[in-house]
Amino acid sequence: MNPGFDLSRRNPQEDFELIQRIGSGTYGDVYKARNVNTGELAAIKVIKLEPGEDFAVVQQEIIMMKDCKHANIVAYFGSYLRRDKLWICMEFCGGGSLQDIYHVTGPLSELQIAYVSRETLQGLYYLHSKGKMHRDIKGANILLTDNGHVKLADFGVSAQITATIAKRKSFIGTPYWMAPEVAAVERKGGYNQLCDLWAVGITAIELAELQPPMFDLHPMRALFLMTKSNFQPPKLKDKLKWSNSFHHFVKMALTKNPKKRPTAEKLLQHPFVTQPLTRSLAIELLDKVNNPDHSTYHDFDDDDPEPLVAVPHRIPSTSRNVREEKTRSEINFGQVKFDPPLRKETEPHHELDLQLEYGQGHQSNYFLGGNKSLLKSVEEELHQRGHVAHLEDDEGDDDDSKHSTLKAKVPPPLPPKPKSISIPQDTHSSEDSNQGTIKRCPSSGSPAKPSHVPPRPPPPRLPPQKPAVLGNGVSSFQLNGERDGSVHQQQSEQRGTNLSRKEKKDVPKPISNGLPPTPKVHMGACFSKVFNGCPLKIHCATSWINPDTRDQYLIFGAEEGIYTLNLNELHETSMEQLFPRRCTWLYVMNNCLLSVSGKASQLYSHNLPGLFDYARQMQKLPVAIPAHKLPDRILPRKFAVSAKIPETKWCQKCCVVRNPYTGHKYLCGALQTSIVLLEWVEPMQKFMLIKHIEFPMPCPLRMFEMLVVPEQEYPLVCVGVSRGRDFNQVVRFETVNPNSTSSWFTESDTPQTNVTHVTQLERDTILVCLDCCIKIVNLQGRLKSSRKLSSELTFDFQIESIVCLQDSVLAFWKHGMQGRSFRSNEVTQEISDNTRIFRLLGSDRVVVLESRPTDNPTANSNLYILAGHENSY
């Protein structure tokens, strides 16, 4: 590159030949390349620039970077700006990052950590002596060469660029390594290069424990914890495994007060890094990467072994005998038509939310804020979430000794035992709001923990828009008695108006490749058989659309594991095993599959594209290899596509909800003696823990649902329904309030009713299924009635499960199903067949039904889906 240019405009491919892609991230892709003139290898980061991103400041960083030449710093070769892509050329480090390495090898040894820490400190000492900060020390940014040399990467120009790019998607991932003074910069008034020394201590823990402290917590909550005055620096968890010297080194690096924290020069004199440490330690580590010993490191729990009985990896659908007659129900399935399923306001609208929350409109105002630093983005996020005002107040927050490093505080005094607790009413509601009836269940003596994340400010009201229509002209305005409208409908309409003509042309018409949709008619769907003779004992079902192929898959959770069925290949129908452990619950969020799996009934998070790729790889293995025993045993962490969510063992029930007021999505799990609440973090594409509430669960736990209420950050958790006691109150919701900082004690003096289903259709509309009756009530448990909506629907059978359609409720019982109109309580559809036993397997996106013969309930089952609606998924 011509040294006269700070940012070359020539074609970089004239100087470098791209060999292979070696990494990718939210910023772009990293390639291994070769200089065509010298033959020298290089690492090239290719970043696609978005409109409005200003990189004028980067040129100044490039000039500064030219002077940075040190054995422990990745050499900078130059940068190219070509069309809308920025190419950053750096020294190639063939050993990879320490994060990549420990994902394969497991924890580093103490001497290896000492060697890496010493080399890192030497690089920081050089940077600090030149008046520079790294600002992003962590395992992912410490690289090894093929010869075992340690190099610091992603600082200077890369740090500035990454900080700018990261505001789009990944700005939230860094707080785990962030020093307290950086987290509280607005109150503390700035920070200096000593923040890098804090990150060295956190990285040492990361290399020893495979993740930084608080990594299982929501990033914003971890950031908030660090700003508290009683925050205690983290320590190594295992006191006996590591030497006193290592413990003391971590303690010195993690000195909370930056004025007392040692400099890089001072820390280089610590006995932990002055002991004899040679490059052979890193070479041994690289050898372990290239020849991993899977017997010494694996990512599984001994209490969750492989299935004892080998089950088929591939299950073909059996062919029906030509002379075999269809059952009476199957004949009716082809004749009875159903209207589309109702999209609830509290249902996480995955694809829509992804574009709305992180689309261009949002980026231009927030993520693409010029050349602001990563820190500034985090500050803005704190402002947006209402945390800043709370940063100045260190009192009144309960302790979270299990997850954080705060000193224990005395919990606040318990309030007097209330008879019932009022729910804030919408100002537009015409209901009497004097008597609140959502009731908090008795909780344990300890307060709900933790509530360190302060409540977000109430969101602004949505502008008036056309109410969303529910079925035959029953709008949400009519259903609610208030002008709330359907958030899903409003957002989709708004999204549609914002699309340019070009974008509309580019959008493919078919949402998925599967069963063909029917024309847009009032009732155009029917149940279609998709599998004949299924031997699995299925507990649940959902569906997913592959973003690359657009093929639609059914995903089943069964005793035998997680299986999938491609609806685009029904001509050669077969189920494929995705995961070998028992599964009792499934939910898909974007490309992430959540499940309750394994012997210990623990929550898992699976990467769906990775899970499908891995299943295909297993099919190519020799038949002699027991593939069902492979996943957790031999798969390195780096490539693991299934991960257990910590602290979620013995999960009985789960539910997912979206808060229509804020757009945030929550996953709640009922454990044996507690409740866990997790929030979806879009940049990280996973649910992360925000609350762990000790609570004695009812036994048996018949129902477990979340209810979103106005002006509350987190949804209430409904664990039961009892008879109403107040005037006009037909039901009373027994709830646990995650927003409370103390325990609420209320005595349940009325027995629970036999409730089979509770679902929140809209903000103040809840459907409660009791025995043979369905009641539509508000948050206070009072019936909602109008000229266009029946408040009660009655059936002549014991309801086992329901699906809400746009005009009706479809109730399932042992030998069939019946639909009744929301308006008139009249029967809209009915299928009955005493020769078959029916069971609803799932209704998220796709309604999936199972059928077995009555005279042989253990026989193989037939599977059906409600198909035919345009845009159904």
UniProtKB/Swiss-Prot annotation:
Q: Where is the composition biased (Pro residues)?
A: 452-466
* UniProt entry tagged with the keyword NADP: no
Q: Tell me what reaction this enzyme catalyses.
A: L-seryl-[protein] + ATP = O-phospho-L-seryl-[protein] + ADP + H(+); L-threonyl-[protein] + ATP = O-phospho-L-threonyl-[protein] + ADP + H(+)
Q: Could you tell me the superkingdom of the organism this chain comes from?
A: Eukaryota
Compositional bias annotation for Polar residues = 487-499
Question: Would you tell me the protein name for this molecule?
Answer: Mitogen-activated protein kinase kinase kinase kinase 3
Q: Which residues carry this modification: Phosphoserine?
A: 329, 377
Q: Could you tell me which species this protein originates from? A: Rattus norvegicus (Rat)
One Gene Ontology molecular-function label: ATP binding
Q: What is its EC number?
A: 2.7.11.1
* Positions of modified residues (N-acetylmethionine): 1
In this chain the CNH domain maps to: 535-846
The gene name reads: Map4k3
Subunit annotation? Interacts with SH3GL2. Interaction appears to regulate MAP4K3-mediated JNK activation.
Question: GO cellular-component terms in the record?
Answer: cytoplasm
Sorted alphabetically, which keywords does the UniProt record give? Acetylation, ATP-binding, Kinase, Nucleotide-binding, Phosphoprotein, Serine/threonine-protein kinase, Transferase
Q: Please describe what this protein does.
A: Serine/threonine kinase that plays a role in the response to environmental stress. Appears to act upstream of the JUN N-terminal pathway. Activator of the Hippo signaling pathway which plays a pivotal role in organ size control and tumor suppression by restricting proliferation and promoting apoptosis. MAP4Ks act in parallel to and are partially redundant with STK3/MST2 and STK4/MST2 in the phosphorylation and activation of LATS1/2, and establish MAP4Ks as components of the expanded Hippo pathway.
The coenzyme or cofactor needed here is: Mg(2+)
